[in-house]
């Protein structure tokens, strides 16, 4: 959204894929179009996000499918926490439940999206042929992790050297954009997180987080990733089933931004 609003000269460099929120919203809405599944009930899609910008994203024309919002409402994690407290809900008194199927299986690559460098790390995993510990460790230690405002790394893909940059914080993004425009640097892939340290420190997260909390949030995502058997999206059986079923012939319509509309 920031690039679309403030640096239109880079608009053509943006990927055509939607954000995870918008992809999932479109898939959910398509899934529940089936009368046997919706059983005559009206679908209301609510997204819980650490990012306040997601509230605007659902209203943007290019984020809609056939002119309709795929996600109806966005609540931040802070708003949801407040609602839980006011409702008197005590998690220690609630029995745990498994996630709903068929959308309850995720990958470690998806989990680490929430920390700076996570998107790039997920891409690097996807480009590998397997997910042995050696391969995962090599990616993890490639320089993609850490809190630095700008990280640069290179990796080999099919005999070609790929240059990537990972930047977090819009101030750092502005500096990098100027360097790219001047010709000082050139990259094949750039990851930008608007918030320092990524989504774990998003504008919708609880405020006042100190260094210990920031580190704990990142560690929580990385620890979850370690314990997940599926490390990348193309190994997720639910994702593969979606492409063979619900998404067949609808990939562009449901997963890509609607570039045929006029942006305000």
Segments and roles (model prediction):
Residues 1-7:
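Short, exposed "boundary/linker" segments that immediately precede the start
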Residues 8-264:
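Iron-sulfur-associated redox domains of electron-transfer enzymes in respiratory
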